[in-house]
């Protein structure tokens, strides 16, 4: 794929590489003057910083909220009421920050968004006031709060911040995002999903028409981390939530082509990719 990127670069087509495995692209392209490299270890690269809760002007808060919940459904094991609890907690967190979920306006002014600490607090309050029995309540709180709290401290807390890298820097130029040093597969998938979400909304907000020629190319390496093959069988916990979420994410990637965004979905084990992703190539 380096040759394809090289040719795109020569023709003035910008690129974004999301690399969760080896970190080789930064060695090939990282030395070029107009290529930005971001990673997860500030000793080697500038730190990737994104705000999962912010969205560009022109995107409705509920649009963003739904897409964000789909990312969590893909990346975290969810069962029974957990997706609904998480969505409710995120909704309340936006309202706590002054957002009107109907008008998508903030009474405190622009630029104020919730954090994972806000969401964790609301998850706890929702479950504490629920009618689930103590055993299930403890299981749901343990699963959700452990994951949410892990995103508020350490490197995750430094990267998932309100002081994010400008979207234009990430998505309009030439950028390599090296996630190869992230240890947790769940966290790696989450970062990949959040980047794709931010890219999608950036393209939608900046769109100046449909069926645009190729303007930008995104390479999604080891794509099974995000677009993993799932069983199509219904489960006793309320249906194939993961499969539906992966399919929606795959469709979002396909729909970005109308804004001039090209995608290369790469994987050494294509059998691990969901069929929805393969159909869209």
Question: Language-model features: where?
Answer:
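P-loop NTPase motor domains
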Residues: 3-261, 277
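Acidic, metal-coordinating catalytic cores used for nucleic-acid/nucleotide bond scission
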Residues: 9, 269-272
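Conserved helicase ATPase motor motifs in RecA-like P-loop NTPase domains
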Residues: 255, 265-270
